[in-house]
């Protein structure tokens, strides 16, 4: 398993010298690489790590990343892409039982969707968050919207949400739909 070490998080900050002085920016590709690495292990509940040490490193990285992004997204008009990444990280933090991550994920997804109600990824990930938080009934509308916006992966979470609510027929329909687009996925 490859997890990023806490000290490498600082590679996110890029410093450039300009005519007006130093300018700092985020290396989005590196950020996405780190988020994707954490997602492999904490994107779903229960989380899966090879060791307790790997989990501790992921928690430390996630807390640091979330804190860095929190500064950027707390302005009056945050970048939607960064707000989605922040919400996603806190969704993972929720899965890792990090204090405060649940509220941060919830607030970030709501804020993002208030400004971008047709954002396919935001609808999908908020639906995943709600479903994994024991709120399957609330997850359904977001997952349905994600599907209508082209996110075929949402069919699996929607099927599982229907199953959690005891609606076996709708669950089967959604899981079959998911399987149609993802025939090699052994989870169905």
Give the positions of each predicted feature.
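Alpha-solenoid helical repeat scaffolds
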Residues: 67-70, 110, 144, 176
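N-terminal carbohydrate-binding/catalytic regions of secreted carbohydrate-active enzymes
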Residues: 51, 62-69
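Amphipathic alpha-helical repeat scaffolds of TPR domains
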Residues: 22-51, 77-94
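Alpha-helical adaptor scaffolds
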Residues: 80-165, 180
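Extreme N-terminal leader/anchor segments
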Residues: 1-22
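TPR/TPR-like (Sel1-like) alpha-helical repeat modules
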Residues: 150, 166-186
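TPR/TPR-like alpha-solenoid helical repeat scaffolds
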Residues: 55-56, 160-166, 185-188
